[in-house]
């Protein structure tokens, strides 16, 4: 097993429900360390840039509108197999298909307002972390 870093967003729907602490507690109780974190209001340009890979898909406009509808929490998580572990904690993208006890099953409203985002690969994690954090903003604990 390897120590990895992964990127996480607590999305506007979860921030609005005031469950930031409940979600981060799940990360920490599963052995992930939060090594960078900030709350921010994404601009339209930031959201479009972050989700650029989806720009040709029909849901892109709605995704950007949702991600700019309120503040988000962007975080870097570190731990053994952090990418896979975070994805397991989040549950399926569609909360109706997410296993009981996962973040999305417990806190998400819909496939669009699904509480959290997590990197799906090492390459994505590196790209996503660099998009929001300078190297000097990420620490080791």
From Swiss-Prot:
NCBIfam families assigned to the protein according to its UniProt record, in alphabetical order = PRK00668.1 (NF001908)
Check the record and name the CDD domains matching this protein: NDPk_I (cd04413)
Q: How does it assemble?
A: Homotetramer.
GO CC terms on record? cytoplasm
Cofactor requirement:
Mg(2+)
SUPFAM superfamilies given in the database record: Nucleoside diphosphate kinase, NDK
Task of the protein: Major role in the synthesis of nucleoside triphosphates other than ATP. The ATP gamma phosphate is transferred to the NDP beta phosphate via a ping-pong mechanism, using a phosphorylated active-site intermediate.
Q: Where is the active site?
A: 117
- Return the EC number: 2.7.4.6
Provenance organism = Pseudomonas putida (strain W619)
**Record has Transferase as a keyword:** yes
Q: What is this protein called?
A: Nucleoside diphosphate kinase
InterPro entries the UniProt entry points to: NDK-like_dom (IPR034907), NDK-like_dom_sf (IPR036850), Nucleoside_diP_kinase (IPR001564), Nucleoside_diP_kinase_AS (IPR023005)
Keywords, A to Z, come to: ATP-binding, Cytoplasm, Kinase, Magnesium, Metal-binding, Nucleotide metabolism, Nucleotide-binding, Phosphoprotein, Transferase
Annotated positions binding ATP: 11, 59, 87, 93, 104, 114
**Hey, which family's this protein in?**
Belongs to the NDK family.
- Please write the reaction equations for the catalytic activity of this protein: a 2'-deoxyribonucleoside 5'-diphosphate + ATP = a 2'-deoxyribonucleoside 5'-triphosphate + ADP; a ribonucleoside 5'-diphosphate + ATP = a ribonucleoside 5'-triphosphate + ADP
Q: Which HAMAP family match?
A: NDP_kinase
Q: What is its main location?
A: cytoplasm
Location in the cell: Cytoplasm
């Amino acid at each position: 097993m390897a120590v990895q870093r992964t990127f996480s967003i607590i999305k506007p729907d979860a921030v609005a429900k005031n469950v930031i602490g409940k979600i981060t507690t799940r990360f920490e109780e599963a052995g992930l360390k939060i090594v960078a974190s900030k709350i921010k209001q994404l601009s339209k340009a930031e959201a479009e840039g972050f989700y650029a890979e989806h720009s040709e898909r029909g849901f892109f406009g709605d995704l950007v509108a949702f991600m700019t509808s309120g503040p988000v929490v962007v975080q870097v998580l570190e731990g053994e197999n952090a990418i896979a572990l975070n994805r397991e904690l989040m549950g399926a993208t569609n909360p109706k298909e997410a296993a009981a006890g996962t973040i999305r099953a417990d806190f998400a409203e819909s496939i669009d307002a699904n509480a959290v985002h997590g990197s799906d690969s090492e390459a994505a994690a590196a790209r996503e972390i660099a998009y929001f954090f300078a190297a000097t903003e990420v620490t080791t604990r």
